[in-house]
Curated annotation (Swiss-Prot):
Effect of a null allele: Embryos undergo normal development until midgestation (12.5 to 13.5 dpc), at which time they undergo a dramatic loss in viability associated with combined cardiovascular and hematopoietic abnormalities. Conditional deletion in the erythroid lineage is not lethal and does not lead to defects in the hematopoietic pathway. Mice lacking Pcbp1 and Pcbp2 in the erythroid lineage die at midgestation; lethality is caused by impaired erythroid development and loss of blood formation.
UniProt domain KH: residue ranges: 13-75, 97-162, 284-348
Functional note: Single-stranded nucleic acid binding protein that binds preferentially to oligo dC. Major cellular poly(rC)-binding protein. Also binds poly(rU). Acts as a negative regulator of antiviral signaling. Negatively regulates cellular antiviral responses mediated by MAVS signaling. It acts as an adapter between MAVS and the E3 ubiquitin ligase ITCH, therefore triggering MAVS ubiquitination and degradation. Negativeley regulates the cGAS-STING pathway via interaction with CGAS, preventing the formation of liquid-like droplets in which CGAS is activated.
Protein name: Poly(rC)-binding protein 2
Length: 362
């Protein structure tokens, strides 16, 4: 696949997420939202912006490829305009490049970098853009930031090439999306980072289309398509089962006995081995989460029943640190394969979202 496929469309739907500072986002939104409204109307893309009480915010672009890149070009042009305005009274000798950050699943970064860095070198040389892939995942997520800098056309071409790589190499395991931490709430939910921008209280989860985004702002019938972000690359039967577990958990609280998320015996072979085998041969790693003290109980459950269910279903080891005096949070360490860790994170987030009403019931 080459960038001609991206440019030609072929009914491929993309979802691109940009991580921006509040000032940049304010410029894109414009006075009374006029700027972003114009971008939506002229591009035909869905443009959603995460809640405003964070130092950083996520801008999500979704739609057919031609609409996505029209909107993307308009955003780049706006950033370029802002640089020009800032240079008017500046004494700086050189003009800074346009710089932005993409947010992508960490499991796809290897394909983007390539063996010995050959792929990312090729992208740099062919587009003229500077590209840097962050070594660490963004907090409470399985995603990394990719920083791109250059002139507008170089950045646009660079992002197109990145999209091609992402489409050819879908993410592995469950993607936990990065959500900038609001100043008023430390909880990270699995339902996507833009839920508050529409005022909706309900979360949208994938049903039978494996390429749908876990993003409540992008509701409605999906196109037959690939998506780049939020895609689940686990087999469809596994995805359907995970969805059923999550949905039934939101409607029927977990019991205090051995019944699990879906009312199935959590000690049964169906649950105990099903998810644990997703990536059983993979290298063992660890990931840390921070959960507020007042919500840790819903993760542990009575006599540890709920945390044990999550351990059995994911195959991961989960350790919850003892309370620290003066701290409002508890440290949770998850150890296992990448797939086990991702699934454990997902199930923990389901519990948090259900407890706080974030998943709702319909």
């Amino acid at each position: 696949m080459d960038t001609g496929v991206i440019e030609g469309g072929l009914n491929v739907t993309l979802t691109i997420r940009l991580l921006m500072h509040g000032k940049e986002v304010g410029s894109i939104i414009g006075k009374k939202g006029e700027s972003v409204k114009k971008m939506r109307e002229e591009s035909g893309a869905r443009i959603n912006i995460s809640e405003g009480n964070c130092p950083e915010r996520i801008i999500t672009l979704a739609g057919p490829t031609n609409a996505i890149f029209k909107a993307f070009a308009m955003i780049i042009d706006k950033l370029e305009e802002d640089i020009s305005s800032s240079m008017t009274n500046s004494t700086a000798a050189s003009r800074p490049p346009v710089t932005l950050r993409l947010v992508v699943p960490a499991s796809q970064c290897g394909s983007l970098i390539g063996k010995g860095g050959c792929k990312i070198k090729e992208i740099r040389e062919s587009t003229g853009a500077q590209v840097q892939v962050a070594g660490d995942m963004l907090p409470n997520s399985t995603e990394r930031a990719i920083t791109i800098a250059g002139i507008p056309q170089s950045i646009i071409e660079c992002v197109k090439q990145i999209c091609v790589v992402m489409l050819e190499s879908p993410p592995k395991g469950v993607t936990i999306p990065y959500r900038p931490k609001p100043s008023s709430s430390p909880v990270i939910f699995a339902g996507g980072q833009d839920r508050y921008s529409t005022g909706s209280d309900s979360a949208s989860f994938p049903h039978t289309t494996p390429s749908m985004c876990l993003n409540p702002d992008l509701e409605g019938p999906p196109l037959e398509a690939y998506t780049i972000q939020g895609q689940y690359a686990i087999p469809q039967p596994d995805l359907t089962k995970l969805h059923q577990l999550a949905m039934q958990q939101s409607h029927f609280p977990m019991t205090h006995g051995n019944t699990g998320f879906s009312g199935i015996e959590s000690s049964s072979p169906e649950v105990k081995g099903y998810w644990a085998g997703l990536d059983a041969s993979a290298q063992t790693t660890s990931h840390e989460l921070t959960i507020p003290n007042d919500l840790i109980g819903c993760i542990i459950g009575r006599q540890g029943a709920k945390i044990n269910e999550i351990r059995q279903m994911s195959g991961a080891q989960i350790k919850i640190a003892n309370p620290v005096e003066g701290s409002t949070d508890r440290q949770v360490t998850i150890t296992g394969s990448a797939a086990s860790i991702s699934l454990a994170q997902y199930l923990i987030n389901v519990r948090l979202s259900s407890e706080t009403g974030g998943m709702g019931s319909s």
